[in-house]
């Protein structure tokens, strides 16, 4: 019982930090220049993206590809006329960072 309580307490401390770290990564990689959490701007909101991908088995893989290569290269979904630029037009995002970002978006 003590171990379970300690683990639960540890998770309460660690998980919010992980969520904040992913949000910071999204900000550091300038994703918020086009996207916002709840409202559409130049690009769809993260909540709209999460809703679109909800329940799709290939969501994370497809999102990672789009985050890394841009939507034109991957044939990814397009909202309105906005397309995700490739990494020549924005900060470099590693494979691991793209996975973190995709997982964070899917939790929105």
Q: Language-model segments: which ranges?
A:
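The canonical Cys-X-X-Cys-His
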Residues: 30-37, 101
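Axial heme c-ligation environment in periplasmic c-type cytochrome domains
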Residues: 33, 44-51, 69-97
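Bacterial N-terminal signal peptides that target proteins for export
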Residues: 1-9
């Amino acid at each position: 019982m003590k171990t379970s309580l300690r683990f639960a307490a540890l998770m309460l401390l660690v998980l919010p930090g992980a969520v904040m770290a992913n949000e910071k990564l999204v900000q550091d990689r300038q994703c918020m220049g086009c996207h916002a959490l709840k409202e559409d701007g130049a690009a769809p909101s993260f909540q709209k993206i999460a809703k679109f991908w909800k329940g799709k088995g290939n969501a994370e893989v497809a999102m990672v590809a789009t985050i890394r290569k841009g939507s034109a290269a991957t044939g990814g979904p397009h909202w309105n006329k906005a397309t995700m630029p490739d990494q020549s037009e924005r900060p470099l995002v590693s494979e691991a960072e793209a996975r973190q970002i995709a997982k964070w978006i899917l939790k929105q």
